[in-house]
Amino acid sequence: MEVNDWQAVNEYASDPEVVRYMDWGPNTEKETKEFIQRAMSTRNEKPRRMYTLAIVVEQEDRLIGSCGINVSNPENREGWLGYCLNRNFWGKGYGTEVARGLMDFGFTELALHRIFATCDPGNTASAHVLEKSGMKREGCLREHKWSKGKWRDSYLYAILEHEWKPHKK
């Protein structure tokens, strides 16, 4: 992700429907530019624990979203992943492709043992992406986050390294 990507990022980050289940947004232009700066600043951290990436449709050379994987607990080799897509690209398999790519990177390059993700119980599309990607729903975190003026539940999904290897084939 680069500074000049801010308009493409802001196209989805400022869309109330896209960010409906997110902890953030809808973004202003300033907030989107700050997000990109934060994402870029983590590239040089040693050790690097955050990887925020642009989702690009290569055939169109178009940025359609962002995703990331973060090493949340290095001692236990645990990380979490997330993604956000421009709604014009929902339902086309990009979310599943991105989630699987992040898992592959997490297990092969970052040597993680466990990768998890959360989603709002109302976000059935994201739950479907996580399940289709090979994650299992482990439970519901009840009122575990304060977001947009209210306590919200999250479904917790995870996959273990030994579960990924056969799933990847």
Give residue spans per PLM region:
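Acyl-donor (CoA/ACP) binding surface of acyl/acetyltransferases
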Residues: 1-17, 56-169
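Conserved GNAT-fold acetyl-CoA-binding loop/helix
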Residues: 17-40, 53
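A short glycine-rich, hydrophobically flanked beta-strand micro-motif that places a catalytic Asp/Glu
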Residues: 49-55
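Short helix-to-loop capping/linker segments positioned immediately adjacent to catalytic or ligand/cofactor-binding
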Residues: 20, 42-44, 91
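Short loop/turn motifs at secondary-structure junctions and domain boundaries
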Residues: 43-49, 135
